[in-house]
Amino acid sequence: QKLCERPSGTWSGVCGNNNACKNQCINLEKARHGSCNYVFPAHK
């Protein structure tokens, strides 16, 4: 399981196989991808 601990930070839960993290990053943070570290793509 991967934690969504990225600097953009509206999600503090666990990135599972569901779309919760993806949707929140895309919908609320205007991310291009579902990855929650879209602000710093090289920082994981």
UniProtKB/Swiss-Prot annotation:
Keywords: Antimicrobial, Disulfide bond, Fungicide, Plant defense, Pyrrolidone carboxylic acid, Secreted. The keyword Secreted applies. Disulfide bonds join C15-C36. The modification Pyrrolidone carboxylic acid is found at Q1. GO terms for cellular component: extracellular region. Belongs to the DEFL family. Possesses antifungal activity sensitive to inorganic cations. Forms oligomers in its native state. This is Defensin-like protein 1.
